[in-house]
A protein has these predicted regions:
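Extracytoplasmic
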Residues: 1-19, 27-90
C-alpha cells in the first residue's frame, strides 16, 4: 500500500491522526476549502492541511491511527476519487 509521508499543518479541521485519506490537492486554499465544504455537506468530517514545502493544500476526508482502517477508507473513496491516497503524518 502506497503511503506518502509529509509534514503538514491543519488549516481547517479537528486534527490529524497517523494516517489520513487525501482526496484532493490544490495550490489554492479557496479550492481546497471548496472541496472540504462539499465533503462536509455529504456528511464527512473533512479537513484541510497545508504542506509549506510544496505550497499545496491537502483535502483530507478521513483520518485514522490504524493503517488497515485508513486503507479500507481510501479504497471506498476511490470510487468517487480515483486518485485518493494515504498521508502519513510526519
Amino acid at each position: 500500500v502506497g503511503v506518502k509521508s509529509e509534514a503538514v499543518t491543519v488549516v481547517d479541521g479537528g486534527g490529524l491522526k497517523a494516517f489520513s485519506v487525501v482526496v484532493g490537492s490544490f495550490g489554492s486554499k479557496a479550492n481546497a476549502l471548496g472541496l472540504q465544504q462539499r465533503l462536509k455537506n455529504q456528511g464527512h468530517a473533512a479537513q484541510v492541511a497545508y504542506n509549506p514545502s510544496i505550497n499545496f493544500y491537502r483535502v483530507i476526508v478521513s483520518t485514522f491511527d490504524n493503517k488497515a482502517e485508513a486503507v479500507s477508507s481510501r479504497n471506498s473513496f476511490r470510487a468517487q476519487y480515483p486518485d485518493a491516497w494515504l498521508l502519513l503524518k510526519k
